[in-house]
Amino acid sequence: MKKIVLIVSTVLVLIVATVYADRATRVKVKVPSGNAPQPNDAPDGKPAPEVTFKDLDGKDATLAQYKGKVVLVNFWATWCDPCYIEIPWLIEMQQKYEAKGFTVLGISMDEEGKAAVDPFLAKERFNVNGQKLPMNYPIVIGNDEVADKFGGLLGYPTSFLISRDGKIVKRVQGLISYEELTKAIESQL
């Protein structure tokens, strides 16, 4: 009898853990409304949207502040595993190309906003060429309105490469490869 109770208890624990893990890893995606471009619309050559977001000090920041630079807008979240994989590459690209007029702009889509991002930035260090480094590029807080202006998101990470003249030249949904990222950035510098 004890054996049956132990087996049933173990199965119940596994079921509860599976349900919890599934809910914790789901991406909450809002379908764009109205006349917003759909997520699969090709953005190539379209002007980057005029957007305002909050920086980590609570001040307004705009995409227009980066005009004249090549900008990789990266929508991410602290709980997103593929985002975590690509962050070291973004740190490296920021180091490598910043002097040539490039920057990464990380847009956190965490529902908890600053409350989730601040502890993550304070704690996390990423392996970049054998060094443990913090995120070295600007991070702002995004929301559904910002995502809609970019045409909506199907998940995270989603990145947009914006040329010096403010046009979207590349969109990548999901994890971008290191080689693809390097090639795309270098094509704009």
Tell where the protein language model's regions lie, with residue ranges.
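Conserved redox-active cysteine motifs that mediate thiol-disulfide chemistry
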Residues: 67, 75-92
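Short, internal strand/loop/helix patches
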Residues: 118-164
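A short beta-strand-turn-helix
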Residues: 45, 50-71, 94-97, 150
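Thiol-/selenol-based redox modules, centered on thioredoxin-like
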Residues: 34, 155-189
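Residue-level recognition of beta-strand->loop/alpha-helix junctions
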Residues: 108-110, 141, 172
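N-terminal targeting signals for export/organelle localization
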Residues: 1-50, 171
